[in-house]
C-alpha cells in the first residue's frame, strides 16, 4: 500500500508541476479556448495511450510503474475540473459556440491522442 501511495505521489507531483507550467505558459495566449488546458489534456491522452499499449506488452511490469504513469502522472497532468470551469465560464458569458467548440476539441482531441499514442507503441513494437 505504501509503495502504491508513493507511486501516485511521485507521478502526481510531476504531472501537477507540468500542468501548472504549461497552463501558465499558454493560457493567456487565447483566453476563449485556453490552450494550456487543452495542451495538458491532449498530452495526458497521448501519454496514457502509449502507456496502455506498453503495459499490455509488459504484463509482468511492477504495478508501481503503472500507477505512477496512469494515476499519478496523467491524473496530475490532465485537468477535467479546469476544463469544466472554463466551459462553464464561456456558457455564463453567452459564448455558446466557444463552449461547444471547447467541449468538442477537448473530448475528440483527447480520444485521438490516446489512440495515436496506442498505435505508435503498437507500430514500434510490432
Curated annotation (Swiss-Prot):
* A GO CC annotation given for this chain: plasma membrane
Activity regulation info:
Na(+) is not transported, but it plays an essential structural role and its presence is essential for fluoride channel function.
The record's GO molecular-function terms, alphabetically, read: fluoride channel activity; metal ion binding
Q: Which reaction does it catalyse?
A: fluoride(in) = fluoride(out)
Q: How does it sit in the membrane?
A: Multi-pass membrane protein
Pfam families this protein is in? Answer: CRCB
Coiled-coil-forming residues are none
Q: Where does it localize? A: Cell inner membrane
Q: Which InterPro entries match?
A: FluC
Transmembrane intervals: 4-27, 32-55, 64-92, 96-121
Coarse class of the protein's main subcellular location: membrane
Q: Which residues bind fluoride?
A: 41, 110
Q: Name a single GO biological process.
A: cellular detoxification of fluoride
Report keywords, A-Z.
Answer: Cell inner membrane, Cell membrane, Ion channel, Ion transport, Membrane, Metal-binding, Plasmid, Sodium, Transmembrane, Transmembrane helix, Transport
Which residues are noted in the entry as Na(+)-binding? Answer: 75, 78
What job does this protein perform? Answer: Fluoride-specific ion channel. Important for reducing fluoride concentration in the cell, thus reducing its toxicity.
Into which family does the record put it?
Belongs to the fluoride channel Fluc/FEX (TC 1.A.43) family.
Task: Share what the entry says about its subunit structure, partners included.
Answer: Homodimer.
**What is the UniProt domain comment for this protein?**
Shows a double-barrelled channel architecture in which two fluoride ion pathways span the membrane, and the dual-topology arrangement includes a centrally coordinated Na(+) cation. The Na(+) ion is probably an important structural element stabilizing the dimer interface.
Know the name of this protein? Fluoride-specific ion channel FluC
Which organism is this protein's natural source? Escherichia coli O45:K1 (strain S88 / ExPEC)
- Gene designation: fluC
Amino acid at each position: 500500500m505504501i509503495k502504491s501511495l508513493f507511486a501516485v505521489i511521485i507521478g502526481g507531483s510531476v504531472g501537477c508541476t507540468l500542468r501548472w507550467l504549461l497552463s501558465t505558459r499558454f493560457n493567456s495566449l487565447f483566453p476563449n479556448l485556453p490552450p494550456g488546458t487543452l495542451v495538458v489534456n491532449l498530452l495526458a491522452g497521448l501519454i496514457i495511450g502509449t502507456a496502455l499499449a506498453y503495459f499490455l506488452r509488459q504484463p509482468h511490469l511492477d504495478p508501481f510503474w503503472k500507477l505512477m504513469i496512469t494515476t499519478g502522472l496523467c491524473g496530475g497532468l490532465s485537468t477535467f475540473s479546469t476544463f469544466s470551469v472554463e466551459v462553464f465560464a464561456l456558457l455564463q458569458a453567452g459564448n455558446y459556440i466557444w463552449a461547444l467548440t471547447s467541449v468538442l476539441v477537448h473530448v475528440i482531441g483527447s480520444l485521438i491522442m490516446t489512440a495515436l499514442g496506442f498505435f505508435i507503441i503498437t507500430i514500434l513494437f510490432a
